[in-house]
């Protein structure tokens, strides 16, 4: 170690006695590379070795002292935390746990209450919806009944007026159609809801002081179809004796006609025996001659007059 220290002192003496560090030498001028030549730049001259070693030792001692001080502070702080702050922290933690537990319980209770309330509201809505639907159905039924009465009100009013007049005349005058008969342009019509052969239908009408309907105009034709569609219906036209005739004697040749295309054809292909001598109105209103034993609905007609007899 002593030898190394002497070597270091010798190196320092040599550096101080170097001729290039003594200002200007004999016959020469001291050149400073960093000053004399601006184009030459290099690192600054190195510090003495002893100074560098001293700086390193001081830095190490300072770092060691700081670490020891930091360790002491940590130990003291930890000890205080374990003694006082730790207990307070534990208390605060327990308080937070309790508050969270209470919050969870209250929230769960509120959710259950909302769910129960929502279920009851849903039941009420369902019940109200059912009641509303029933009320709508009742209103629709009342509306339909009202429309029905309004539709038949004029007929009912005429019937009441007719009955009043009949009572005032002590039965001597009858100016309205019988019950279940429909009045149209001075005639009374009865529409069947079952079927008969043509001859049986005509006989039924005669028992009512009427006959199978005789169609005299397009207006009457339209009225008949409105009440018979979609059924095939017998009318009072036949050619059983070889020529077409209306049952009330109306002239066939000059009266209204509404035959379907190619009709009458007296077709025999029905394989029922006999010819087609009776007329039925089809659902589209066109006339067709048919086998008289076919079973169709029918319409009776009679004129309305003061005595109620068939005109």
UniProtKB/Swiss-Prot annotation:
Compartments it resides in: Membrane
Membrane topology summary: Single-pass type II membrane protein
Residue spans crossing the bilayer: 59-79
Cytoplasmic side: 1-58
Modified residues (Phosphoserine): 13
Membrane found in the keyword field: yes
Protein name (record): Asialoglycoprotein receptor 2
Species, as recorded: Homo sapiens (Human)
Gene: ASGR2
